[in-house]
Amino acid sequence: NLSNLGLNSAENFIRKYKIHNEILWDLYREDKISKEELRGKRFYLTLKEYGIEDERLSEKIGLEYVRKSPLKKKLFPYTIDVLNYLNKKYEMHIITNGFEEVQHVKLSQSGLSSFFKHIITSEKVGVKKPNIKIFEYALNKAKAQKDESILIGDDLIADIFGAKNAGIQQIYFNPNKIIHDENIEFEINCLSQLKELL
């Protein structure tokens, strides 16, 4: 409980956490820190901003977060509708840098498992997006050709640049309308827009 630690605003804590989490995920993706360091440091650095330097507490919060996070069922608007639409026309797979032990629980809890044939995690493959090897592995696993495949992703570097470098068409899902200078052929802010493209 955050109030027990003297932290009055959960919103401020979450905002600070998200900043640290994003920076650490970038370092993890670049193989500059380990999975364990990512898990431990994101809460340690957040708590440190409040004058709390407690590694054991940070680790405890981190483990609890990893346990509870996949159980959340909140989806983007139109998720099920669009997946039902795509499922009739395409074979779908997931490529993720997320932790192996979390992904299957997350998909199962949110009722999405049945839509995807393969869940390809960077931990299993041994390389992370945007490394082209994970995209090549995915194509091979799906028995698919580059020119018949398309990647829909919400991370410009890991997903969009990664797929582009691997020769795969991409659609950038940018729900927060993040401003960027990149020349993206297909960019959407709402999943319902996929019906117009696919």
Stretches found by the model and what they are:
Residues 28, 37, 42, 77-80, ...:
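Solvent-exposed, flexible loop/coil residues
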